[in-house]
């Protein structure tokens, strides 16, 4: 594969394939979230090491070819996608849009609107794949890559060894760039301004997600020696905890820039007073739809049935979350850990206790 060893500028995307993968991933998380209807056993072989590339909806011709050539990578594409969705759900857990899609919605519905939510979806899943592939390389699970080949950082102390097995972030970035962007290269529609607008937006946000992982990667060091001494000091490159990536992208979601696309396919800020976006900013071209009500056309679930916080003035409060429809208070029984005790050695053992609590549910 060409171009997997250096950082390049962004080019096209993949979201239909990712959303297809979600159908198996998210049936394990919550049945109503992002379900597309393809069974896991049809996507992966019995051992989770073989992917049936011809069974996957949404792949372009080049993506299908890459899927066959790099078949062992696809399991980690799914794992990264799953990680991205779970982080998306956590980041938006108290919002009207909580990274959910109606179970009967097709995967292209979430991308029918070029909103801030679509921007975040592209970025977080793209970043998830980069981290998943980078760590799979380090673990020796992929034949095409291994430990990071990054050069020794200039600021590293002379008595520290550079050579521990680090996450192969450069290969992971290159593979994600090549695979994710293949769909846009295959399905170009230069005369359709709407398609060009979405393509330019998605290209940018995918790169923002990838670069979020690349730029947050850091040097990690460890001491080795007899009886706790630090006679040997070893350092390596490590990708960050994914929550760090989620937090960064959530902030960029809040600060996302509204764009317009010129007849030449170039993105420009919609308002002249706005700054030009950097390659790590999120951008969008459409206003967000109404997430208060069910919208089958766009696969929006609405907020009816969502739990709200009675005393909160934020979006998770009953006043905002329920969109003025009011709420119902119910006494429900929950199971919580209790009577926890430290056991030698070394874990905490808890009992499971039932407790009745009040919950407020949007009408």
UniProtKB/Swiss-Prot annotation:
Localization per Swiss-Prot or TrEMBL: Secreted, Extracellular space, Extracellular matrix
InterPro entries: Wnt, Wnt_C, Wnt_CS
GO molecular function: cytokine activity; frizzled binding
Residues linked to a glycan: 48, 98
Modification after translation (UniProt): Palmitoleoylation is required for efficient binding to frizzled receptors. Depalmitoleoylation leads to Wnt signaling pathway inhibition.
Lipid-acceptor residues (O-palmitoleoyl serine): 227
Disulfide bonds listed in the record: 88-99, 137-145, 147-165, 221-235, 223-230, 292-323, 308-318, 322-362, 338-353, 340-350, 345-346
First and last residue of the signal peptide: 1-27
Chief place where the protein resides: secreted
Gene Ontology cellular component annotations, sorted alphabetically: extracellular space
Keyword vocabulary terms for this entry: Developmental protein, Disulfide bond, Extracellular matrix, Glycoprotein, Lipoprotein, Secreted, Signal, Wnt signaling pathway
Cross-referenced Pfam families: wnt (PF00110)
GO BP, sorted A to Z: canonical Wnt signaling pathway; cell fate commitment; neuron differentiation
Free-text function comment from the UniProt entry: Ligand for members of the frizzled family of seven transmembrane receptors. Probable developmental protein. May be a signaling molecule which affects the development of discrete regions of tissues. Is likely to signal over only few cell diameters.
Family, per entry: Belongs to the Wnt family.
Protein name as annotated: Protein Wnt-5
Organism: Halocynthia roretzi
